[in-house]
């Protein structure tokens, strides 16, 4: 999360970047304004070896395990307003996955529909307008944050559906709850290598967004900014602030 925030700072200078990464160990992440205190059991997560973090972006809970996280940063006006940029980025993601044989599509957008509130429910339980699905089930969960002339959109591309863990870590849930999401493994066997997946996404971003993002090592300035931001994301006062 600290690195994503640091890359967002570079977006203020006009830089467009794409970062792809995984999590070790598995991690439960909360949306920026999601109520988590009293709703999720941090002790239970720790006993299972699961980290917990709060994202700088909005949205709902995601379990990061056997998935690939993407992070896109850019100037805030690069692709229009929040809704337009969100839709264009998600269309690029879907296009890249289709090149790998995944029947990915974007849920139709109803601009007059209500804005979803950050509830305790798992992000992957409900495909929302503008999100990437396959076979009617949610494949990618994304969220966007804008600040100081830059945007950060990141999200989880499921390789396998392990999102039931989100519900397993809820407080007071007496029965197991399935999360009807879908992972790439249900459509592609064997799974593409990280290099092949990265290549497909880079090419689709370059085509759909008309500007190929940088996908390279952090600059010294970005490393310094990430180091400063790291303390916030390791602090329980941020993670469990609400």
Q: PLM features: residue spans?
A:
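A glycine-rich, hydrophobic loop/mini-helix early in the fold
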Residues: 39-80
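Internal, conserved structured core segments that host functional sites
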Residues: 67-129
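Long, positively charged amphipathic alpha-helical accessory segments at protein N-termini or as interdomain linkers
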Residues: 93-118, 146-242
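Aromatic/basic-lined ligand-recognition segments
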Residues: 125-143
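Histidine/cysteine-enriched polar flanking segments
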Residues: 4, 8, 28, 45, ...
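Short loop segments at secondary-structure junctions
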Residues: 34, 75-77, 137, 161-164
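N-terminal low-complexity, intrinsically disordered segments
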Residues: 1-56, 207, 211
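Gly/Ser/Thr-rich beta-alpha loop segments that engage phosphate groups in nucleotides
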Residues: 33, 60-61, 143
């Amino acid at each position: 999360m600290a690195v994503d925030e640091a890359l967002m700072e570079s977006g203020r200078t006009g830089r467009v970047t794409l970062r792809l990464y995984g999590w070790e160990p598995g991690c439960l992440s909360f949306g920026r304004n999601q109520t988590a205190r009293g709703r999720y059991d941090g002790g239970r997560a720790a006993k299972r070896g699961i980290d917990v973090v709060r994202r700088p972006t909005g949205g709902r809970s995601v379990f990061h395990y056997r998935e690939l996280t993407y992070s896109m940063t850019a100037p805030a006006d690069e692709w229009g307003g929040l809704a337009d940029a969100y839709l264009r980025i998600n269309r690029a993601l879907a296009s890249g996955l289709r090149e790998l044989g995944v029947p990915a599509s974007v849920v139709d957008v109803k601009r007059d529909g209500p804005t979803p509130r950050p509830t305790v429910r798992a992000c992957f339980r409900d495909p929302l307008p503008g999100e990437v699905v396959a076979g009617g089930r949610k494949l990618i969960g994304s969220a966007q944050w804008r600040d100081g002339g830059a945007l950060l959109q990141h999200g989880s591309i499921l390789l396998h559906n392990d999102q039931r863990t989100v519900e397993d870590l809820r407080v007071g849930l007496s029965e197991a709850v399935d999360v009807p999401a879908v992972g790439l493994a249900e459509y592609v066997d064997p799974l593409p290598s990280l290099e092949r997946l990265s290549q497909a996404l880079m090419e689709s971003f370059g085509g759909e967004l008309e500007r190929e993002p940088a996908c390279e090592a952090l600059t010294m300035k970005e490393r310094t900014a990430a180091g400063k931001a790291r303390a916030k994301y390791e602090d329980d006062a941020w993670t469990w602030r609400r």
